[in-house]
Amino acid sequence: QLMTSTDIPLEDIYQVVYKMTLEEFERIYDSKESNGNKFIQWITQKDTSILDFMLLAKTNEYIRLKRNSRWYYPSMKIGARMTIEEVAEKALSVNEPKLRDRYLLQAIRALFSLGRYQECINLWDSEVVQLPKDNLMRQLIHPYIAGAEFRVKRSEKAITYFAELGD
């Protein structure tokens, strides 16, 4: 509601962000029909930057879920508009100030899935640490960085991050 309007019921936002599948969201993205949902109405008519972000985020989650399946193999067709590499590239290239922290989270999630741990760490060092400590996106990114540090064999730094996270 802080990014859109207090007139939008939280339930409408919840339905789109947490419940709607990628396929359902793609239909809305393509048709711009709100189906009575005030959040969809807002992002399709008043702030399409949020619409574009939501498509990228839902695509990222869909691909990551497929890649994490025990039945996944690299040559498998996933059925998404873009690859995980393209998701990472797009997330890094968008310079929308009000959504930058959200795009950073998506970039780091995609890069982590690709095993590009040093790039995750570089993003943390160059941008994420500049976000306020109470920023939710920074808090969601932090565990990925702890894991990335561990995977690039910087155990001391990883342990420090894991300790900060209470893990």
Residue ranges: model-predicted function:
Residues Q1-R109, S113-D167:
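Extracytoplasmic/secretory-pathway proteins
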